[in-house]
A protein has these predicted regions:
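Glycine-rich beta-strand-turn "strand-cap" elements at beta-sheet edges
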Residues: 2, 39-51, 76-98
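Active-site-flanking beta-strand signature of metal-NTP-handling nucleotidyl enzymes
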Residues: 3-8
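Short, surface-exposed ligand-recognition loops at beta-strand->loop->(often short) alpha-helix junctions
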Residues: 9-19
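Feature marks short, surface-exposed loop/turn motifs that line or immediately flank catalytic pockets
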Residues: 12-14, 44-46, 60
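An amphipathic, aromatic/His-enriched active-site/gating alpha helix that lines ligand/cofactor pockets
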Residues: 24-36, 55-89
């Protein structure tokens, strides 16, 4: 299992619109093969910041399976205009879990 990590910067005045758009977008990503689950969290200390964590079976499921899918174009249309700056996306493998 791979964990995708992205810190999303969104204008706080757009939070409700962003969250509504993300609610639609989650149906797109959840249909991608080898997607496991995602969590979107809103930062309590910094209202412009969200943390997106997505679990995939492997990196290629995200970088190829999702990003090269027809659904990714719709995902981009729904969400990318909210990000300023555009987020860095990284992938992690579990070392230790309790």
């Amino acid at each position: 299992m791979i964990l995708e990590h992205a810190v999303l910067q969104v204008d706080p005045s757009q939070s409700a619109r962003f969250e509504a758009a993300f609610d639609v977008a989650r149906t797109i990503i959840s249909e991608v093969p080898r997607f496991i689950r995602l969590r979107l969290s809103h930062c309590l200390e910094s209202p412009e910041r969200y943390l997106l964590l997505v679990e995939w079976e492997d990196v290629e499921s995200h970088t190829i399976g999702f990003r090269q899918s027809t659904g990714y174009e719709k995902w981009r249309e729904l969400l990318h205009h909210f990000y300023e700056p555009f987020p860095t996306v990284e992938h992690y493998s579990t070392v230790l879990e309790v």
